[in-house]
C-alpha cells in the first residue's frame, strides 16, 4: 500500500505555510489554527469522478465544523480528452466542483483555491473550482512581486477577475517530505 504522506509533498508544503508553529524555525500565517487534512486527489489519473471525491471531502469538512477550506488542486484536462474543459466552461457553474464551491461559500465557509499551475503551458487559465463565485482564488508571485511563470491567470468566461489575490509561491521557505 502506498504511503500517502510520501507520494506528494505539495499539501505538506502548503500546510506548513499556514499552520507551522515553531518560532525558532518557521511560523505560518495561522499557527494557532486546528486542521483537518483531507485528500481527494487521485495522483495517477485525471477523471471527472475526482470532482465527486472533492465535493464529498468539502461536505465532510462542513459536517465537522470547518470554517476555512484551502484547496490546492483544479481540473481542466482529463484522461478522456472528450471531457476536457474549454475556456467557455470557466463560468463558475459548469464544473461540479465549482458549483459545490459556490454552495459552500453561500453557507458562510471561506474557500481558498489555487489559481492553478498552467501558466507556462498551453492552457494558461485558472482551473475549477477557482472559477467559482465567492471563493478566494490565489495566484503565485515571486519575492520581487512578479507573477510566477507557472501561475494560471484569469479572467473567467463570464468576465470576473481571477485570481483575486496573489501570494509568494516561488522561493518560499516550506516544509517538505524530503527535508
Residues covered by each model-derived region:
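Glycine-rich, acidic and aromatic/proline-enriched surface loops and short helix-turn segments
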Residues: 20, 67, 71, 167-171
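Anion (oxyanion) recognition and catalysis
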Residues: 62, 102-106, 166
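Hydrolase catalytic cores
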Residues: 15-18, 38-42, 125, 169-179
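Extracellular S/T/G-rich loop segment that most often corresponds to the catalytic His/Ser-adjacent loop
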Residues: 1, 127-179
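Short acidic, glycine-rich surface-loop motifs adjacent to enzyme active sites
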Residues: 61-91, 114
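Active-site glycine-centered loops adjacent to acidic/histidine catalytic or metal-binding residues
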Residues: 101, 116
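Subtilisin-like serine protease catalytic core
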Residues: 1-50, 64-67, 80, 106-108, ...
Amino acid at each position: 500500500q502506498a504511503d500517502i504522506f510520501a507520494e506528494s509533498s505539495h499539501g505538506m508544503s502548503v500546510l506548513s505555510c499556514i499552520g507551522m508553529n515553531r518560532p525558532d524555525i518557521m511560523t505560518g500565517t495561522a499557527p494557532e489554527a486546528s486542521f483537518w487534512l483531507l485528500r481527494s486527489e487521485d495522483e495517477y489519473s485525471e477523471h471527472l469522478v475526482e470532482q465527486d471525491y472533492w465535493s464529498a471531502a468539502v461536505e465532510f469538512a462542513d459536517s465537522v465544523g470547518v470554517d476555512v477550506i484551502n484547496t490546492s488542486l483544479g481540473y481542466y484536462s482529463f484522461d478522456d480528452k472528450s471531457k476536457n474543459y474549454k475556456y467557455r466552461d470557466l463560468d463558475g457553474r459548469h464544473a461540479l466542483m465549482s458549483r459545490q464551491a459556490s454552495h459552500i461559500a453561500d453557507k458562510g465557509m471561506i474557500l481558498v483555491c489555487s489559481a492553478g499551475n498552467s501558466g507556462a503551458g498551453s492552457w494558461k487559465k485558472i482551473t475549477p473550482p477557482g472559477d467559482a463565485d465567492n471563493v478566494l482564488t490565489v495566484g503565485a508571485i515571486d519575492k520581487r512581486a512578479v507573477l510566477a511563470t507557472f501561475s494560471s491567470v484569469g479572467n473567467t468566461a463570464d468576465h470576473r477577475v481571477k485570481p483575486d489575490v496573489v501570494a509568494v509561491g516561488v522561493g518560499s521557505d516550506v516544509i517538505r517530505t524530503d527535508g
